[in-house]
């Protein structure tokens, strides 16, 4: 499986126009990838920032997705404050823990998303698999998680939660037992 994450900085006051574009033009343009594009989600952590993540079959699908994405971006270039940043790669880890969107439709989810600069991506993920993911998978609030290895020193991590409170409750429990996040600090070079 392959994943693509996109960060778009757009001009202040253009959020409604951007949403309208995605609904009326951007998403319909992706119909030709049906079956190979598994999932796509966008969210706005700030009024002028749009983050998106898409999951697809393989690199070939990602190349087709990039073509459509670039054509779409040309149509909204007057809304953009800068050229988008794109991170893509093979899905390094990933798991859907609950099919809660089918069983319990939700109007909203909480997405925790980070780009990490690490000293060694494989070492970081081995530690993640050893001490973090087993605790994560037991939590009631987690829906799905994964990471994308961009290169040997860059990872994109994401977690879908039932709510913002569920994520923060998990972090508090994790730090109450032991400060798990501290164990990752020697492997970090930075994050955004």
Can you name each region flagged by the protein language model?
Residues 1-51, 55-192:
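Short S/T/G/P-rich N-terminal loop/turn motif that feeds into the first structured element of a domain
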């Amino acid at each position: 499986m392959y994943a693509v994450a996109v960060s778009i900085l757009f001009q202040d006051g253009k959020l409604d126009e951007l949403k309208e574009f995605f609904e009326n033009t951007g998403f319909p343009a992706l119909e030709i990838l049906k079956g190979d594009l598994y999932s796509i989600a966008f969210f706005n952590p700030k009024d002028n920032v749009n983050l998106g993540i898409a999951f697809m079959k393989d690199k070939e699908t990602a190349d087709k997705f990039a073509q459509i994405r670039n054509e779409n971006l040309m149509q909204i270039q007057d809304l953009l404050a800068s050229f988008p940043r794109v991170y893509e790669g093979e899905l390094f880890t990933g798991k859907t823990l609950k099919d809660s969107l089918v069983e319990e439709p939700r109007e909203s989810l909480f997405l925790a998303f980070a780009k990490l600069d690490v000293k060694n991506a494989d070492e970081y993920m081995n530690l993640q698999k050893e001490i973090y993911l087993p605790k994560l998978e037991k939590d009631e609030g987690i829906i799905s998680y994964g990471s994308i290895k961009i290169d040997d020193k860059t990872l994109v991590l994401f977690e879908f939660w039932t709510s913002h409170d569920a994520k923060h409750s998990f972090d508090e429990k994790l730090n109450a037992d032991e400060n798990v996040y501290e164990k990752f600090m020697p492997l970090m070079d930075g994050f955004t």
